[in-house]
């Protein structure tokens, strides 16, 4: 099952208050890099059921993406209790994502 990118983005204060491990994925449904990354992200997340995965549709002027300094898609931001621990831009392998997930879910 593919989760769609949410057009309505959460506020930064809400994200900062999220408990536990969270993966914020910034992208767009029409982005080729984003589509190619989906199987890699799904594979990496399969071993991390406790990680909250939030997909946010990003565009210029979107405040949440700018607050995380997102410039290219997909950008994956890994959070533990609302604090950024890692960021991946256009990940090239599931292993790369798994290493970042291990930092927040362990």
Show where each model-derived region lies.
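Non-catalytic, surface beta->alpha helical segment in thiol-disulfide oxidoreductase systems
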Residues: 78-106
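Short pre-active-site segment immediately N-terminal to redox-active cysteine/selenocysteine motifs
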Residues: 19, 27-30, 72
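Structural signal for short hydrophobic segments within the conserved structured cores
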Residues: 3, 54, 85-88
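Structural micro-motif
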Residues: 68-77
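The canonical Cys-X-X-Cys-His
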Residues: 31-34, 76
């Amino acid at each position: 099952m593919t989760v769609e990118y949410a057009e309505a983005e959460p506020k930064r204060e809400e994200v900062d208050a999220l408990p536990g491990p969270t993966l914020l994925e910034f992208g767009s449904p029409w982005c080729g890099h984003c589509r190619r990354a989906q199987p890699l992200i799904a594979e990496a997340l399969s071993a991390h059921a406790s990680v909250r995965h939030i997909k946010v549709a990003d565009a210029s002027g979107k405040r949440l993406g700018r607050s995380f300094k997102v410039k290219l898609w997909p950008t994956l931001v890994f959070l533990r209790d609302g604090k950024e621990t890692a960021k991946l831009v256009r990940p090239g392998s599931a292993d790369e994502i798994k290493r970042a997930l291990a930092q927040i879910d362990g």
